[in-house]
Amino acid sequence: MSVLLETSAGDIVIDLLVDYAPKMCENFLKLCKVKYYNFSPIHSIQKSFSFQTGDPLGPLSSESDGGQSIWGLLSGDPSEKTFPALFHPKLKHLERGTVSMATVPHPSDPDTRLAGSQFIVTLGDNTDYLDGKAAIFGKVVEGFDVLEKINDAIVDERGHPLVDIRIKHTVILDDPYPDPAGMREPSASPPPSKAQLATVRITEGEELLDVEASEEAAAEAERRRREREAAAQALTLEMMGDLPFAEVKPPENVLFVCKLNPVTTDEDLELIFSRFGKILSCEVIRDQKTGDSLQYAFIEFEDKKSCEEAYSKMDSVLIDDRRIHVDFSQSVSKLSDVWRSETNSKRKSAARRGGGGWGGVDELEKWRKYRDEDVEWRNDDSYQMVHGVEDLKGRHDGDKPPVRDSRPDVGGGRDRSTSRRSRSPRRDRDRRDDRDNRRGPRDADRRRDDRDLDRRDRRGDRSRDRYRDRDYNDRDHRRGRDRDNRGRDDYRRR
């Protein structure tokens, strides 16, 4: 025997244990048959433990009586509102989905517990706390995903879900018990009463509307974000020169053909596709270095209709033992190439006419390495002697008068040697560096080589002067020694 509970969270199928709890199964079946549970709220949700239902009004209503059994409902006798519950020793709360009647102790006999219409469904395993407090009469066999939804519901501090979860309808799949006297099954599910409607917090429909509205708002926000991102990327490509303008769209009369055989040529494709209309261009893209086919091509038709007809009829057609794929072109590289070539040609023509700052554009200026005032060259590029002739002579020639330079006097009538010696070496070096900076790199390299060669020559001259001076000193020493020896020889003769 089974019962189907249609809830706002989904459907749950319960198998009844009529052999272990016949009276409780009969009470539950007959209450489902008279639609007593319709619109009953699910409340007291304890995560991973249990939830409770079966009261048509629920604990939030002040008019609720906690529910009653089928016999009390039919007779109206308060004494039959509840009945003694039977606890079978073999039935324990060990598995998730165990269904049991909620009970309360008898006012006069605490060992006897009374059941009415409310029942409990466990949401976790090993909920043995309920043993002896709730009488088991069934188990859930289908709808465990619904139990997960109920377990994850948002609840307040008393365990009541913020969004109503209610039993919408009950369907009896098998009923072995005869109907009690006076019971009549309604022909249709009755609408909820005013007392039941007063207990509504947030209906499922309102939640769905809110969820759908939030989903639509999120989708709209995502669409706008993608549009802004695409516009920004297009603007970036336009600034980089890869697109003629940001709003450029791929042409509608160009087909993209791929998966070609490497031996297929432009003429072959043009001949095959020309039956759909006039072809303006047909190009198989090839490698720039090797010239080999990259096995895809672009075909440009004169009108859009011919392009669409070729697309609908030539996809997956066999050409040169290869089944090709045809699609509309999404490339704008050809438009960009045409735009770039036209722009460059306009700039070149404007530059030839002398218009614009540079390249035909007023805002551009040709880059210059040096300023105009820095390229003034000296008229006299000849080198001048730094040392006088007397500086190149030996130390023993210092008593001779200085030799004047035969060239025109630069220092205002003074000796050239004196004028050069009065100038500091650092000043000469700074002037040399300034002169080298104003000249080109090749002249600087040549002058550097000349200076190195001159430095080596002067080093050799100094070495020779040093050896020459040493020879003079040795010669003077030998002459003095010879005179002393001759003097001693004369003394001995006397």
UniProtKB/Swiss-Prot annotation:
Coiled coil residues, start to end: 206-240
GO cellular component: nucleus
Protein keywords: Coiled coil, Isomerase, Nucleus, RNA-binding, Rotamase
Source organism superkingdom: Eukaryota
Pfam families assigned: Pro_isomerase, RRM_1
Database matches in CDD domains: cyclophilin_RRM, RRM_PPIL4
EC number annotated for this UniProt entry: 5.2.1.8
InterPro entries: CRIP (IPR035542), Cyclophilin-like_dom_sf (IPR029000), Cyclophilin-type_PPIase_dom (IPR002130), Cyclophilin_PPIL4 (IPR035538), Nucleotide-bd_a/b_plait_sf (IPR012677), RBD_domain_sf (IPR035979), RRM_dom (IPR000504)
Record's keyword annotation contains Coiled coil: yes
Major subcellular location class: nucleus
UniProt domain RRM: residue ranges: 253-331
Record function comment: PPIases accelerate the folding of proteins. It catalyzes the cis-trans isomerization of proline imidic peptide bonds in oligopeptides.
Protein name, UniProt field: Peptidyl-prolyl cis-trans isomerase-like 4
Gene name of the encoded protein: cyp-6
